[in-house]
Amino acid sequence: MKRLFIDLDGTVAKFNVRNALERFDKEKGFFAKLGAYANIEVINELAKTNKVFVISASPNEQADKDKLVWLSKFLPNVNSTNITLCRLGENKAKIIESKYNITINEDCYLLDDFSKNLFEWCACGGRGIKRLTSLADNSRGLWKGWAIKNLIELQDFFA
C-alpha cells in the first residue's frame, strides 16, 4: 500500500521563507496563520482512504502548537497519530522509521519543497515528490525526480 508523507511549510501551507525567517521565531501563532495552497482538499480526501502522514520540521515548541492548529483547520482528516513534528535539520526518513517502526521503501512517498529532504528520503529507500511553488524554492535544483506544481496532480496516483 502506498503511503504519502507530506511536509507542511512551502508544500501545502503558504510559507515564504524569505519573509518568514525573522518572524516565525518571534511571532506567536505565525504558523497557525499561514494560508493553504489551492486544492488542499485533495490531501484531505486522500487522508480518508489512504495512509497519509505529516512530517514537518519546526524551530520550537510554539511552532509545533501552531502547526497543530493549522492541521486541524486545513487537514482535519489526517489522523493525529500520523502527525510527526521534528526539529529543523533532522532526517525525516530516520524520524519516521523510528516513530512508526517501519522501513522506508518504494511505497513510501515524501512530498516536500526542500530537495535535501527528498535526497535523504530516497537514500533510505523511499520515493520523493518535489513541490514547486512560487513562494518556496521554485526550481528543481539538483532534483531530477517527480515534481508537481499543483496538489491535484496527486489525486489519481494515490486514489
Predicted segments with their positions:
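Short hydrophobic segments within beta-strands
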Residues: 7, 55-57, 111
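Substrate-recognition "cap/lid" segment bordering the active-site pocket of phosphatases
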Residues: 57-106
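Short, acidic loop-to-helix structural element flanking the phosphoryl-transfer center
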Residues: 22-53, 61-65
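Short amphipathic alpha-helix with an adjacent loop that forms part of the alpha/beta core around
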Residues: 94-103, 146-159
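Asp-based phosphoryl-transfer active-site loop
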Residues: 2-16
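Acidic, Mg2+-coordinating phosphoryl-transfer loop and its flanking beta/alpha structural elements
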Residues: 105-149
